[in-house]
Amino acid sequence: EIPVPNKVPMPRPVDAYFKDWQGPTRPEFRRDIDMTQLTGNQKWQLYCLEQFLNMYEPITIGYTTGVYDLFHIGHLNLLRKAKAQCDYLIVGVSTDELVSYKHKHAVIPFAERKEIVAAIKYVDEVVTQENMNKMEAWEKYRFNVMFVGDDWKGTDKWNKIEADLNAVGAKVVYFPYTKGTSSTLINETLHKLRGE
C-alpha cells in the first residue's frame, strides 16, 4: 500500500498553480466536494491527492446522453455496452425543454426519466442535459470517452465533435442501435392501439 502524505507543502504563489485548474475531475471528488468551501491549502492538497490517485489508480470516465423516453431494451443495451468500456459511467438525460427544442415531445416527464435511468445498475451518475454542447459537457465532467449511436457516425456535426474531443484527449465510440425498437416506434404503436 502506497502511503498518502497527510500534509503537502503549498507552493507560493498559489495562483500560478491553480490558474488553469478547473477543480477535481475524478467523480468521487467532483461529486462530493464543494470547491467554494475549501481554503487555498485544502485545494492544493486535493489537487495533489488527485494527481497521486490518477497516477496509481487511473479511471476511465464514460459519458453518454439521451432522452430515455419510454425506456426500452435499446436503451439498456447501450448503457450495458458503455459501462463495459469504462470504470465510471455518467449519463446525461435531456430536459423536457431540450426535447421540445428538437421539435419532439417526451411522454415521460424529465424527473421520472432521470429517476428511471438512475436506477439502472450500469449507471454511476445521472446528470441533466440542458443543451447539446458536448465540449461544455467535457469541461464539466472531463470524460475520457463518449458513447453515441452509430446513426450519427460520419455526419459533419459529429466529425467536428470527434475532432474537438480528440484534441483534449477524449474519444467517441459508436454503438449500433438495437434494431426493431425505439421510443418513437413504441409511441406510434401506442397511438395506433388507442385509435388516435
Task: Give a label for each model feature.
Residues 34-46, 50-196:
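Nucleotidyltransferase catalytic core that binds NTPs
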Residues 1-56:
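Adenosyl-5′-phosphate
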